Swiss-Prot record:
Family label: Belongs to the major facilitator superfamily. Sugar transporter (TC 2.A.1.1) family. Glucose transporter subfamily.
Region (Disordered): 522-553
Short name of any one Pfam family annotated for the protein: Sugar_tr
Provenance organism: Xenopus laevis (African clawed frog)
UniProt name for this protein: Solute carrier family 2, facilitated glucose transporter member 10
Membrane topology term: Multi-pass membrane protein
Amino acid sequence: MGLRSTTLVLAATSSLLGGLIFGYELGIISGALLMLKTVFQLTCFEQEALVSAVLFGALLASLIGGFIIDRSGRRTSIMGSNLVVLAGSIILIATSSFWWLVVGRVTVGFAISISSMACCIYVSEIVRPHQRGTLVSLYETGITVGILISYAMNYFLSAVNDGWKYMFGLAIIPAAFQFIVILFLPSKPHTLNFWEQDSDNGFIELEEAGESGEFKPDTYDKQYTFLDLFRSKDNMRTRTLLGLGLVLFQQFTGQPNVLYYASTIFRSVGFQSNSSAVLASVGLGVVKVASTLIAICFADKAGRRILLLAGCIVMTIAISGIGIVSFMVELDSHRDCGSIRSKNTSYGDSNASQLLGIIHAGTPTINTKDNLAHQLAMVIQSPSLSNSAGSKHTASMFPNSTVPPAGPDSNYAILNWITLLSMMAFVSAFSIGFGPMTWLVLSEIYPADIRGRAFAFCNSFNWAANLLITLTFLEVIGSIGLGWTFLLYGGVGLLAIAFIYFFIPETKGQSLEEIDQQLSSKRISKRRETSKGVRKRPSTGPPYQRVGKSNWT
């Protein structure tokens, strides 16, 4: 295996490990919280604070992480995030205080947010155009795999004394591996031939330069300030709006909340035992992984726009279908953080039910992207749904809804299965479209000098929108009902389809310099400009010239 092939494998491994850490940290809290609630006698507020800590850490990282990534370099930022994950994990393992648990989770959230941004940007800069979609999308695959691993660890460690410490501590392993892998990758990639198609097969030429190295090709000479993101210079304001549109539509189509009802839906269609419930949740996770792999295979063939459009169309149909069905079959929407462990429910039963609540990543997920604040901390009530107290509580919260029986009614069986299939379609569509493609496009559309800050700026809106959607979900349901809530998400999906179709340009097969040239024009074409000779546009500046290796030797 040559040097370039080795570097390619290492870049892919680093991207996959980065996503795995992100997904694992998002998913592991679901099982750990069950133990922590008992060990630390956590109140509802404390559970919410503990689960939301990762979100706030990630939001903080999004606000300042861009400056860190642009100033310190991508590779250094990734390595630093690994060390911060190590520090956060040690705090979580060693602590005997609730507030130190919160500090540990904030620390971990900060680290995985920095890593998610730096990984996507670094990999996009280090690989050739025809490999960029695949390699960057590997991060999303890592997220889904990380969540699946967290499912398994939650289940197998639930009966172990101090199992929550092992759950948190296991994150050190992939972080250590990524730290080692990144040591063998270049400090700062530089293109010597603009990734031309007729260059050597495989990997771009790299110059091993220091993190502060000044060598850059002509198209990398431009310097930007943060305020340039809101100015007309090189069409930066439009690029910023494109990035914000993607991350906001990703959240406002309802993906942080739709899977909150996974547990109810699974029970409705007959997944009521411990083993079948866990199997169902893992099965849905497997669907998510498989869908992400499909996105990887087609990102550099079908293109970003096609996958975004296809995914968003299916998501809109699926979420609207769930909304329509919910008018005919009333789903239980009660959740009570005090009932995470019912006195009538075994620990294993609670763990199985809890596992069903976190079946999504985004997001750089990175997911992220999960309904963390409520989906995990305020878990659905125990399987004993038909007790009078629970029914009375639910009736008071949702006067127009009814509590379904523990088992599926034969009259509603078909509708319940339609709901389940719609949810699986929603998960698959997100994993093909918004999940990986949003972060891939964000890593491509900004100039190198400001790419880290621009990515982080958009990512901060992603986390903020996630929190907003999560924290207002119950209030929206109480105001307009579950069915109309999901139909509202469907309406947002229609707007997202129009936004993608009319404004998002195709970037497949183009070098980052070619994409920058395309987006610098006042009018952004949504059609792909082929890399085999980018369509020439009238220009008042110096003509674009191909630079070969001979020019630099």
